[in-house]
Amino acid sequence: MEQKINTFSQKLVESYSIEVTPRSAANIESFKDVLPQNTRVYIAHIEDEDIQSMVNTAKRLNDEGFHAMPHFPARAIQNEAVLNHWISMYKNEAGVDEALLLAGGRSKPLGDFESSIELIESGKFDQAGFKRLHIAGHPEGN
């Protein structure tokens, strides 16, 4: 029984993920000192942060051997041109091929997108060669 518990605990620890903001990431000298290699690290999209700081955080994480997965909040994306720009920046500057799609914290959309499904239906992530998309659902709203 103890062996099964230890195996379960080990698998649980090996498969967890964590979320950072560019600001919090700036306080960490090396992620290798605080996280196991290959950990998936979600990068929160903070509307008052510029997209370049989020892309730089993703690049740093990927360069250090982690799986950067930035947030794409639908309601904060003005239009397809902005979505294309963000996808291109993450893909070409940071080597990102995974993303977390969510509606976002705004109650009303800033532009053309209201939900994560609309981001998927745009086809932009497929066109860019993204390999994995996660979707966040908040039944109570987000």
Language-model region placement:
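Active-site beta->alpha loop and helix N-cap motifs at the rims of alpha/beta catalytic domains
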Residues: 2-142
